[in-house]
């Protein structure tokens, strides 16, 4: 399975609460890497966020880091692509409850074998969800994380992101939904904003950023 298919899915009161819970009030968080803007680069083409190095750290490490048990799943898209994910329903980072989704870098043959051994299949709005065997769940936890999606529980004003991340290299608006993607290729980061929705931050290794951006460019337009 290609990396592209795996990789592919004034401050208001709430924004002030986000800042307060994350950094400014009442003081520094216990861990600086609890913050979504604390991005490290162990190497030029790698990224480390929330204490996890994408492309190296595995799902087991994420469970230890977040002190929560993940929910592993296998998804089949309408065009037949298989994607392995683990989902954290609620993690507490810098005092802010959030959801985290990890896409797992599993070889295509392994994904197909897991699919064939699946216990149950349910139809979702975006394809099919396969319940994995206990053995495959344990195996899934040993493969590297290819992308991390962070979903904070509060709506956040754009000014917060500008202050913490700076100006994006590009802004791309989806034609169909109107959502706007702020792109930071040097950090492998795509921040999705718009329509009054809560933000979504997706991190990938910078070397794979083109694979994330390509579908956006095909289905959207670059804003001036």
Q: Positions of the model-derived regions?
A:
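Short, Lys/Arg-rich N-terminal segment immediately upstream of the first membrane anchor
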Residues: 1-5
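Hydrophobic membrane-insertion alpha-helices, especially the h-region
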Residues: 6-26
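A cross-family detector of function-defining hotspots
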Residues: 25-34, 59-224
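Acidic/histidine-rich, surface-exposed loop or edge segments in extracytoplasmic proteins
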Residues: 39-50, 136-146
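Short, flexible active-site loop motifs that bind/organize anionic cofactors or intermediates
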Residues: 49-52, 151
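Glycine-centered tight-turn and secondary-structure capping sites
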Residues: 55-56
